[in-house]
Amino acid sequence: MTLFLDSSALLSVAIEGRGRQVVIDALENDAQWCASALALSEALALVPRLTDEQVLQDDVEDAVRLLWDRIHIVPVDQMCLDRAAMIAREQPVHINDAIHLAAADRLPRPWQFITFDPAQIPVALSMGYDVISS
């Protein structure tokens, strides 16, 4: 099976918290990991909000990039953006969340969608996604 990580899942690997073990367990049980091309930029943009200490920021960024190097990237091309726009019109999510959902929707099933974003979880479930969260 394939595991699709959104930016919250990608970031949670690098920080202490209950979500970290959820993601690590999921990664250990799946051989193929995917994420939208947006996930890395989104995760890295959040790093300075986690701590003011530059050394800790660098550690988090290194951990995220290390995981990123092992992830298959789903492109955010026009087809993905069109699907994301449709999702955002039909569901109560912001466009950046819809991009992750649209990117995951491009993958052949079965796969699992891992997110800790409370706005994405009900939408992903309503779209028939197998969601992993805490």
Describe the residue ranges of each PLM region.
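Histidine- and aromatic-rich ligand-binding microenvironments
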Residues: 5-6, 35-36, 93-94, 115-117, ...
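Short, structured coil segments at secondary-structure junctions
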Residues: 29, 127-128
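Short glycine-enriched loop/turn motifs at secondary-structure junctions
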Residues: 26-28, 66-69, 106-108
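Active-site-proximal, substrate-binding regions of enzyme catalytic domains
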Residues: 40-72, 83-85
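Residues that scaffold the ATP/ADP-binding catalytic core of kinase and kinase-like folds
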Residues: 13-14, 46, 123-124
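Short, well-structured N-terminal submotif of metal-dependent ribonuclease cores
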Residues: 1-38, 50-62
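Active-site neighborhoods of divalent-metal-dependent phosphate/nucleic-acid chemistry enzymes
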Residues: 71-122, 129
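Phosphate- and divalent-cation-binding pockets in alpha/beta enzyme and binding domains
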Residues: 22, 42, 83, 122-123
